[in-house]
A protein has these predicted regions:
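Conserved strand-to-loop turn within each blade of WD40 beta-propeller repeats
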Residues: 7, 25-28, 67-70, 108-111, ...
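Loop/turn-rich, solvent-exposed surfaces of beta-rich toroidal or solenoidal domains
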Residues: 133-162
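Per-blade loop-tip surfaces of WD-repeat and WD-like beta-propellers in eukaryotic adaptors/scaffolds
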Residues: 1-10, 16-20, 29-52, 57-63, ...
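C-terminal amphipathic alpha-helical segment
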Residues: 104-107, 118
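Loop/turn segments within WD40 beta-propeller blades
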Residues: 14-20, 55-61, 97-103, 143-148, ...
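Intrinsically disordered, low-complexity segments enriched in small/polar residues
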Residues: 66-67, 102, 148, 159
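C-terminal extracellular loops and terminal segments
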Residues: 91, 97, 109-110, 137-139
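Non-catalytic, largely sequence-independent nucleic-acid-binding elements associated
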Residues: 178
């Protein structure tokens, strides 16, 4: 399918609870929800800032979390018109990743940190940083390991930094890309 409707770059797309609905985030400052059967946009949410990444936080597809260039993480309920409970971070958000249990959100931030948020409390519970680690561009991506015990991210120096979520300490720095 080709879906048209955004008027700027689309930087994020995720399935929304079922294989027939997709949500997209764009530099046109909107989120769009698409019905793949009709190939049409069924809802547009105006975010106020360029959306760089998004995740869906429940199996039903009713919650969307979006990360923006205005340093804000926004929470959206697809059953209502507007967002709620925004969290402002100290830099542009370059990526979001959701833990397997959907309790934690990992955000990569242009202030050269990763922030771990507890979604039950809607607050930052830890900040990962390291000497030498630099978020090199607006599209740097961070991710949880499949077991949720580690987080990994690439750095502008070509290294991969891996932290333990339990100890909050650097586990290793892989320099094979340098």
């Amino acid at each position: 399918h080709t879906l048209t409707g955004h008027c700027a770059k689309v930087l994020a797309a995720k399935f929304l609870g079922e294989p027939t609905r997709v949500v997209t985030g764009s530099h046109d400052r909107t989120l769009k929800i698409w019905d793949l059967r009709s190939r049409a946009c069924v809802e547009t949410k105006f975010t106020g800032s360029s959306c760089n990444d998004l995740v869906t936080s429940d199996g039903s597809g009713s919650t969307i979390i979006s990360g923006h260039f205005d340093k804000t993480i926004r929470f959206w309920d697809t059953r209502t018109e507007s967002g709620s409970n925004d969290i402002v971070l100290p830099g542009k958000i370059t990526s979001l990743d959701l833990s397997r249990d959907a309790n934690y959100l990992l955000s990569c931030v242009r202030d050269d940190t990763l922030k771990l948020l507890d979604l039950r409390m809607k607050m930052i519970v830890f900040t990962f940083s390291a000497e030498g680690f630099k978020v090199g561009c607006d599209w740097t991506r961070a991710a949880f390991s499949p077991d949720g015990q580690y987080v990994a991210v690439g750095s502008s120096d070509g290294s991969i930094y891996i932290w333990s979520v339990t100890t909050n300490k650097i586990e290793t720095i892989l320099k094979d890309h340098t």
